[in-house]
């Protein structure tokens, strides 16, 4: 599972899409995340690239999986419910009975992980994940779905694994477990984010702490003075300091800042550059402070090296490079780059999505009425026997697909 990778499949009325995007940008500037998917969000599109994307073909009702490299449709119309994004050739899907099963991409007929799992994570870069069976606590399972460890009843919640560690909550405090389920950092924090780039933000006694994977404090900051914006990425983390944005290095020291960057924008360093917000518009700036693309777009998102997805004032999406030159014309109502193939984009025009290259040429004969770009079904796991009462979301709350945004758009 990638850190903070919450990707909404923007569809429908573009004015509503932009409102939703701005709401998300406001959430990004909230204080500390309790867990992935809460307040600290990944700002760019370089995480979570995948070869396989769940889709619903136009004219169909069931889910298939698209190979974005070959254009082939796999597991065609095999699933009533939306599968998770495929990670390491495996994916999770909910059955009609409401339980989760795991399949391999080359065999969608035979589940490798059966059982009455009410929650089941994907494996990502790890050989283990979290799972919860009906009426039981949280457990760790391997790729053969053998139980590695059943966590104590006092453990009420966990995040997914990231960099070999997972945040967990016990007796109302947060710490970190390793992939064997051992407590490597004791539960002593009020809140905690997952690890990214070897660092995590935690909250303790009204102080924001940056800790390393040994649990040692790298930096302590006042909650009144600093406000984390996003996770560490490529060695830096953006943080709001009053109305300014400063980037902290991995020692927690201020590495650079720029007065042109507003604190409620979305910042993450990629290739020595970051998207920045000014006067309600987005542009591109280097870490040296040079404005590369003036802030003129309603949204701007890092897609790949030297490629950025932008939305203009006509609510049309296109792709620009780091000089601001147009690579893909602004003629689509939606655009996403999630494929491991760098020049493959999902583009939306009307009610359908198509897979295109940078020349705007369609790469498959099919079009798609729905995509799952949201990642895993479950990013936070809840014990069903925890001694500490916690809010447990309904299964449908675990992921966000195109229908969610379409319902919002129709309501307006």
Give names to the regions the model predicted.
Residues 1-20:
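Short, Lys/Arg-enriched N-terminal segments with co-localized hydrophobic residues
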Residues 44-394, 412:
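Residue-level detector of conserved, function-critical positions
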